[in-house]
């Protein structure tokens, strides 16, 4: 009953643990659809693959922990079954021990009764020996008296004495038979006692084993409680991490909405640029049609002028056609040369663009929070003080536009911008120590850099147009109009400072969010490493305890073997003692019998 009472708290703990495990499994099952929805939403997002990978890894770790818990529960069930079997075996052994104890008590009572009988027989032997000695003394006296006096015949005196001797001999034979039977009983009882001692020793060994197993079960229950607490802590950590991931997802959604809003503004700017280019192309077509109309008008004017002139004053239309043909061929050659130059310039500009895009990528990867915050502060200060002017901070390089008398913005030349960009890139690459790559911040900032780089290069086609107009010999008024339209186009092409500041703020917030995500991921990695270390320590402790169990079992086996050897030696010594005592008793009895026979012969 005590053992059952001792095992009841463990069963209660196991029941509570099963309830807790079932609750945890139901919670995990309820959490799995939310995880699936999050994974589907994460697949729809761009640049959130690391978060999804982290969630998958955390789910895999939770599944591994669940498997370990199920294995531990299976081991606990197996241990409980083994404990129940051991309890049954202990109960059976206790019953057998009670039976053997009762048998031992009965055997002890029989031995006491037999010992009392042996004592009585020995006393009777002593009395018979005393009577024998008295009879012998009386015979001697009778013989002595016969010698002296005439006495009755000796036969009359010896007959009753011989009858008594025969009776005493018969009693002695009976007593010897009784002694032999008692010796046999004592041997059988000693063998039964040895068997009982062996069973008692085996029962004691089993009881000690049961005690050891109970202690080990208590230690295992303590370890299970520790593991349960650790699993609870891990569940709390997992919930916190899930909440953090949800917060990060919300921040990513907000950032993507902000980026989409900025992208809409950038798309509007691109639409305006496209419209401006289409208008420039239409203007070129109109200029060509004007030139053709002028040539046709000149031809018609020459024909009309030649109608009223004399034959001598008329101009040969063939010569005029040849001159016009030469003029047009020269213009076509010039246009071809300009096209070749423009192709070369476009190729060189494309190469430079690729180089500067690579440099911008390196710069954006090398830039950190302090540089972005300082550039944001300077740009906000400049925009608040100068109004329409703006400041472009690309890794520390500033490109401030100049203000004309009319209030229009004139940008720097592309060469000066490229030099400033290369200088800023070299300085940032020298001073940058660590890079933190965000999810989509690099590509979005590259798109913004493309817009900024393509902005000042829109001046080139206008300059080419002005050169074409001068080469064709157009009027200076048309050239001035083209320059004014070009200035207006450049002014319309420029991005306002407020939009740029908003985009820059969004980029800074994106970088901060990316940095916070990196830190949270590092913290999660550290926590996972700590949990892995704890699991390793637990496995090592379990291995050490298993080794200790094996060693203790081996030691117990050795002790049992030693006990068996000792029991065999004791049995051999007891058998030797019994054989020696039996030999001594036989010798004594034979000596006594021979003495008595000699006495009877001497008396006869």
UniProtKB/Swiss-Prot annotation:
GO terms for molecular function: microtubule binding. Residues 1-33, 367-422, 434-495 are annotated as: Disordered. The keyword Phosphoprotein does not apply. Its main location: cytoplasm. One of its GO terms (biological process) is cytoskeleton organization. Disulfide bonds: none annotated. Residues 401-422, 468-478 have a biased composition (Polar residues). GO terms for cellular component: cytoplasm; microtubule. The keyword Kinase does not apply. It comes from the Eukaryota. Residues 49-351, 521-569 form a coiled coil. Residues 233-470 are annotated as: Required for targeting to microtubules. Keywords: Coiled coil, Cytoplasm, Cytoskeleton, Microtubule. Residues 371-385 have a biased composition (Low complexity). Belongs to the MAP70 family. Plant-specific protein that interact with microtubules. This is Microtubule-associated protein 70-4. The lineage of its organism: Eukaryota, Viridiplantae, Streptophyta, Embryophyta, Tracheophyta.
